[in-house]
């Protein structure tokens, strides 16, 4: 049985602050607890502080020059193996992004997206 939104913590990571705020606002409106980060280093700091609480990582695929969303997810899984991940990106046409998503059988949502599409994906990932 999955947790209710009020018992679920989601970390949102994207180098575009507008996307972070958009996703956080949608999720908070549904009752989710949200942690926000713009870069991988912020996300890693937050994950160290909240590692037992983070249920879902929503991350951009291509972020900062230090780490991709895939690499960030790998790092977080070392701390919390059961963390779920939803990748978001506006660069699906990029062959590397497509290969990485398909090879991991990952859950992916292409930007731009509608709020209801985001919520459906999140519910699906958490189920």
Where are each of the predicted segments found?
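Phosphate-coordination loops involved in phosphoryl transfer and adenosine-cofactor binding
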Residues: 5-8
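Charged docking surfaces used in two-component/phosphorelay signaling
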Residues: 21-29
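Alpha4 helix (beta4-alpha4-beta5 surface) of REC/receiver domains from two-component response regulators
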Residues: 67, 71, 78, 82-110, ...
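Short acidic/polar segment at the start of the alpha1 helix of CheY-like receiver
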Residues: 16-20
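Acidic, metal-coordinating helix/loop segments flanking the phosphotransfer/catalytic sites
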Residues: 36-56, 96-97
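Active-site residues of response regulator receiver
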Residues: 60-61
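The C-terminal output helix
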Residues: 123-127
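Acidic catalytic/metal-coordinating carboxylates
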Residues: 38-42, 67-72
């Amino acid at each position: 049985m999955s947790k209710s939104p009020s018992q679920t913590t989601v970390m949102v990571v994207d180098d575009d602050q507008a996307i972070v705020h958009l996703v956080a606002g949608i999720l908070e409106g549904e009752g989710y607890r949200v942690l926000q980060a713009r870069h991988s280093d912020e996300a890693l700091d937050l994950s160290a502080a909240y590692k037992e609480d983070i249920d879902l990582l929503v991350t951009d695929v291509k972020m900062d020059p230090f780490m991709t969303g895939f690499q960030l997810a790998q790092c977080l899984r070392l701390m919390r193996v059961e963390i779920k991940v939803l990748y978001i990106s506006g660069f699906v046409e990029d062959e590397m992004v497509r290969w990485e998503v398909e090879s991991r059988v990952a859950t992916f949502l292409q930007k731009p997206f509608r709020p209801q599409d985001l919520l459906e994906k999140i519910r699906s990932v958490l189920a």
